[in-house]
């Protein structure tokens, strides 16, 4: 265990696994567009996009739990203790983050949405250092946050203009989504030291996915045309989420929030809302 711990805290290993997460999340973007096309989910249909995401995350959670069961050679079902930790993570990460983001992104520009989304990692660091006091705030971390966010702003402004308007249901909801993401990151960092990060990830995904699906259906969302190709897309995206978010949870279990967040881009739901 000590050897595993040492490897997972080495900066090179953290950076490598972070890159794997980024590649997986990046690969999801064009596949999601294809999935929307095959399943006849319109780019402006927020409710159906939430249903799409809910099904994807429910399946991702089930896949993670199956993998954990195979690895441990026993059925890994969440007990009462794990559920106590999984519920707040589920509400912050899968439900809160994605619900508010999908609605917010439909009511703001891509530039402002991208810039506000870029705040997620830095909110997580501030919460970890200043609210939960899991780690010390240092000048290096402050510099990393400032430079990182400046980079996000520059990238999103290249060739685009920015208006300064602010709407609660638009920019406000995206900001709430990033606060939810920051909170979930800190919670995973705390809880993964007490329970298996893999089972925690699988459980919160399954519960959160079911809740998102029900919310989307309640908003009159649906998949317009269920085909074999569309189901294959959902399965691939579920695999991406299962692998990437589980790696992310494992990294957070062994490292400070700031070390993980400053090494790679936030796993924002932007990929699921791109069309």
Predicted ranges, named:
Residues 38-93, 123-127, 180-184, 201-219:
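Transmembrane alpha-helices of multi-pass small-molecule transport proteins
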Residues 22, 33, 61-64, 124-126, ...:
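Transmembrane alpha-helical segments that form core, pore/gating elements
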Residues 114-117, 133-154, 164-170, 227-231, ...:
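Loop-to-transmembrane alpha-helix entry segments
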Residues 264-269:
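Conserved small/polar residues in nucleotide/adenosyl-binding loops
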Residues 24-45, 59, 98-108, 116, ...:
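Juxtamembrane C-cap of transmembrane helices in multi-pass membrane transport proteins
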Residues 69-113, 117, 154, 237-257:
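Specific transmembrane alpha-helical segments of multi-pass solute transporters/efflux pumps
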Residues 2-54, 164-190, 239:
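Glycine-/small-residue-enriched transmembrane alpha-helix faces in small-molecule transporters
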Residues 35, 52, 104, 130-133, ...:
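Hydrophobic/aromatic residues within transmembrane alpha-helices
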């Amino acid at each position: 265990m000590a050897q595993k711990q040492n490897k997972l805290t080495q900066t090179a290993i953290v950076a490598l696994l972070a890159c794997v997460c980024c590649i997986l999340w990046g690969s999801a973007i064009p596949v999601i567009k294809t999935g929307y096309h095959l399943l006849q989910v319109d780019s402006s249909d927020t409710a159906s996009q939430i249903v799409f995401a809910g099904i994807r995350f429910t399946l991702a959670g089930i896949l993670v739990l199956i993998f954990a069961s195979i690895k441990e050679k026993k059925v890994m079902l969440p007990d009462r203790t794990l559920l106590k930790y999984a519920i707040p993570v589920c509400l912050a990460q899968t439900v809160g983050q994605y619900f508010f983001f999908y609605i917010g992104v439909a009511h703001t520009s891509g530039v402002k949405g991208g810039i506000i989304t870029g705040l997620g990692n830095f909110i997580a660091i501030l919460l970890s250092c200043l609210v939960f006091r899991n780690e010390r705030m240092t000048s290096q971390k402050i510099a990393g946050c400032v430079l990182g966010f400046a980079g996000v702003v520059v990238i999103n402004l290249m060739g685009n203009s920015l208006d300064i308007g602010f709407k609660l249901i638009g920019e406000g909801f995206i900001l709430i989504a990033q606060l939810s993401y920051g909170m979930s990151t800190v919670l995973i960092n705390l809880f993964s030291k007490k329970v298996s990060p893999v089972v925690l990830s699988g459980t919160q995904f399954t519960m959160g996915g079911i809740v998102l699906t029900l919310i989307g259906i309640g908003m009159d969302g649906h998949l317009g045309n269920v085909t074999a190709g569309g189901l294959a897309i959902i399965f691939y995206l579920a695999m991406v989420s299962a692998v990437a978010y589980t790696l992310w949870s494992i990294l957070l279990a062994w490292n400070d929030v700031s070390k993980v967040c400053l090494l790679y881009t936030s796993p924002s739901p932007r990929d699921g809302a791109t069309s």
